[in-house]
Amino acid sequence: MSLWGGRFLDESNETFKKFNASLPFDYILVKEDIFASIAWSKSLVEVGVLTQEEQKKIESALISLKEEIYNNSKKILESDYEDIHSWIEANLIKKIGELGKKLHTGRSRNDQITTDLKLWCKRKIFVLLDSIINLQKNFIFVAELNDDVIMPGYTHLQRAQPITFSYWCLAYVQMFKRDVSRLKDILKRLDISPLGSGALSGTAWNINRKKLAISMGFSSETNNALDSVSDRDYLIELLSASSISMTHLSRFSEDLIFFNSSEANFIELSDSITSGSSLMPQKKNPDALELIRAKCGRVHGALVSILVVLKSLPLSYNKDLQEDKEGLFDSLKTWNDSLLIASLVLKNIKLNRLSCRKAAEKGYSNATEIADYLVKKGMTFREAHHVSGKLVLRAIKENKSLNDLDLSIFQSYSALITDDIYKNITLEACLEKRSSKGGVAPNEIRKEIFKEKERLNIL
């Protein structure tokens, strides 16, 4: 059944019909389409298109249809309808006859599809928020469990300054907090109903759009029908948020892949989220993390795709907008799956504390402390930086750590240095000194963990 055949003399070419059909992917919107259709049927009662009895028959048939789909989800895909709207209308008519043909009065697929999409996106946002918050909780759990594990912090993948594993965890808590904020912000603009906009210029029926919007759980209704059916900003924003968050997940994965490598050996990943080699029996590969890292690309691709689809598109609805869905559906599923896997990885992670500390002791990550020490003794920072660099070069030549250099060597570079230098360049001292807000000092980390536990209601 086609919803638009009256004006045409010839049947659609079969190849074109398949090319034109969106049912193979927009069937995902079946619950939203039925939900919005029930709300629409109630509005049609208020304007005299339907009687109360007719509306109840339509609603009952739609609910029955939803239950049938629940029991046999393949039922939709076994048909050859153009889209989910035509599938629902055709099956409604099969159930209740001519009455089913009244439902589409005053409504266009143009406002229908964007309403369905907004309802679907709203539902998915709450699922994603739960997954992100759960991941944050796992970061906090791991941070609290390992708050005394000192490891190197890196710049340019070179050891830079000592940090703790807890501090690393808290960095990602902040990243994902921004992701939560973005989703909540998107929700404000998404939560506006376009239903009742018609094809592009509004509906000729005096529908109470405010009441209709609230009945579907929206906060308000849109103000311009032409914009309403054209608007896909909310998809751009949602795909942008997913791209940013997947970038965070990809960086998280890259960090752990390196930490898990034989060269670093900071962590051990659980057998449950790794795999082996078909040839090399010793291998334990971080497949879960590598897949998250790779899947980031497909999500970024979906964002680029929707931007390109919209960039030269005239108002209002154009068939190009059919291409707004597959990337969206895939991206949000990929994002949520990646969040769930990231939580699994964290839940089962084991730290090699000794390896972490040994790595922090190497690479002269305490060199900055010498510069700060000399500044406190009265030297300018630029000169102190130079002296510290010379001492690092000397330690490299002697194949020693800075802590192992004799006091006489320190003093040969600056008379300001006394034997208190040693207590100032221990790893613990490096951490304790960075007690400004946001610093790596253990007390600051404990405060931050408490604040985050309070925010996430896990005290």
Swiss-Prot record:
Gene Ontology biological process: arginine biosynthetic process via ornithine; L-arginine biosynthetic process
MF-aspect GO terms: argininosuccinate lyase activity
Catalytic activity: 2-(N(omega)-L-arginino)succinate = fumarate + L-arginine
Gene3D superfamilies: Fumarase/aspartase (C-terminal domain), Fumarase/aspartase (Central domain), Fumarase/aspartase (N-terminal domain)
Pathway recorded for this protein: Amino-acid biosynthesis; L-arginine biosynthesis; L-arginine from L-ornithine and carbamoyl phosphate: step 3/3
InterPro entries documented for this protein: Arg_succ_lyase_C, Argininosuccinate_lyase, Fumarase/histidase_N, Fumarate_lyase_CS, Fumarate_lyase_fam, Fumarate_lyase_N, L-Aspartase-like
GO cellular component: cytosol
Keywords from the named record: Amino-acid biosynthesis, Arginine biosynthesis, Cytoplasm, Lyase
Keyword Lyase: yes
Domain of life according to the entry: Bacteria
Keyword Cell cycle (UniProt): no
Cellular location(s): Cytoplasm
Chief localization: cytoplasm
EC class (word): lyase
Assigned EC number: 4.3.2.1
NCBIfam families (UniProt xref): argH (TIGR00838), PRK12308.1 (NF008964)
Protein family membership: Belongs to the lyase 1 family. Argininosuccinate lyase subfamily.
Protein name from the UniProt record: Argininosuccinate lyase
Organism annotation: Buchnera aphidicola subsp. Schizaphis graminum (strain Sg)
Gene: argH
